[in-house]
Amino acid sequence: MVNLKELSQNEVLELINYVKSLRKQNFSYSQISKKIEIERNIKISKSTIIRWCKNSNNPFNKTKFIDLSPSPELSYIIGVYFGDANIYYRKKTGSYYFRIKVVDKDFVDVVKNSLIKIGLNPTISYVEEKTRSNRWHVEASSKSLYKFLSQNKEELFKVAEKYPEDFLRGFFDSEGYVTSNKIALENYDLELLEFSKELLKKLDVHSTIHIAKKKGTESNIRGEIYHYKDDFYRLSIHRKESVRNFAIKVSFSIKRKRERLQKLLESMDKH
C-alpha cells in the first residue's frame, strides 16, 4: 500500500482532482477512500478526503511547490544532475536535497539561478577541503525535485528533448572539457552519451563515442589507486564546423571552458 508521502507533487495534484471528480459524481467520502485503495493501491483517510473536497487542507504546506513543467531551466538542471550533481535524503531532518559541489563560482551561480527559476530557494557556500581543491556548494531542499529526478532517465530525456541546448550545456558544464583538438565529455552511462549524441546531431554537431578506459583499468587519483568499475566512455567533437556549431548553439556557462573553446576555434581557423 502506497502512502501519500511517497507520491510526487504532480501525483498528489492529480489525486486531489480525481477525488473531487468522484465527489461530484456523488460518491461518499468512504466510497472514495475505498475506491482509491482498490484502484490505485493508495491509502488515504476519509478525513483527508473531506479536507481536500472542502479546500481546507493544502498538502503542500510542508512541501515547496515548484514548477516541474518542461523549461530551459529544468532541462539545464537535468543535464547538471546527470553530471556533477546528486540528490540525497537526510534522515535526521527528513529532508530531501539537490546538491552540487564544483570549483567554478560562475557554474554554481547558473545552477542557483536555474533552481530559483523553478521555485526553489537554494543556498551557496564555499568549503575549504584538505584532500582536494576548495569547492563551491549549492544546495536546495525539495522532495518534489528529488522524486522528479529519481524517475527513469527516459522520463527526464523527454524534457531534455524539448530544450536540447540547455540540457547539453548543463551536461557539458558538469562533465565536458576542451583540449587542443576537441571538445569531449566522459561518463560511465553509454545510453546517456548516445542520447546526447543524438541531440547534438539535431544541432548539426557531429560527435563520436568510444571507450576511454576499459573496466578494471588502474588509475591514480590524488595518490589513491582506483580501478574503473565498468567501461568508461568518451564522447568527442572533432570536426571544425561541429566545434563551431557547438560554440554557437550550446557552449559553456563556465568562463574558463568558454575561453578554452575560443582558443580551440582560433587554432582550427589557422589550419
Curated annotation (Swiss-Prot):
Domain of life assignment: Archaea
Positions of the DOD-type homing endonuclease domain: 77-205
Gene Ontology molecular function terms on file: endonuclease activity
Name of the molecule in the record: Uncharacterized protein MJ0398
Organism: Methanocaldococcus jannaschii (strain ATCC 43067 / DSM 2661 / JAL-1 / JCM 10045 / NBRC 100440) (Methanococcus jannaschii)
Organism placement in taxonomy: Archaea, Methanobacteriati, Methanobacteriota, Methanomada group, Methanococci
